[in-house]
Amino acid sequence: MREAGYGAIIDWSETIAKPADAEDFAEKAIFVVIASGFKSATAKPIAERCMLALRAGLSSATEFGHPGKQVAIDRIWAEREEMFAAYEAETDKLRFLISLPWVGPVTRFHLEKNLGGDHAKPDVHMERLARRDKTDTHKLCRRLARETGYRVATIDTVLWRACAEGLLNSKIYEKKGWKAAFHPKRFLASND
């Protein structure tokens, strides 16, 4: 993955910073709300436009057409100071995060990871990989983290990215195993 140009994302996963302040907390929460159900490449520019609108005193609705997510985004921004203070005071961060608007049982792991927590997000790719190994996402990533010395968050990032970019087909892996699902030559050729 490093040779294919993904060293920066591995380095990021190893050193994810905790939120510096309420605005940083809100921005990360808003990104996760937007990213839910979207590819990261699609979500990033939408999130950037929404943040510009919010900082200008406008609603995210000026930049994003999803009515439910607009309400959640605007609320997170409006209540960022209170939400950040509550997050900082909470010992069970995952339990707190699920109370945020549009953050559910899976996205809370994505958000806590982006807030510096050492977690894996049990999304569709990760769950397929785990099922093949007769385990769950969290146990799979913890085991691989112990074996490699990387953080759980990094293992999650590397495996998810491998699936998202086509290096590893999680659907085929679940059914047929590693040899059928792993495509390094095709992956490296597509990145030339």
Predicted regions and their residues:
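Alpha-helical ds-nucleic-acid-binding substructure associated with the helix-hairpin-helix region
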Residues: 38-102, 106
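Structure-specific DNA junction-binding interface
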Residues: 1-65
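C-terminal accessory module of base-excision DNA glycosylases/AP lyases that mediates lesion recognition
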Residues: 1-16, 70, 74-77, 89-192
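Short alpha-helix boundary/capping elements
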Residues: 34-42, 81, 119, 134, ...
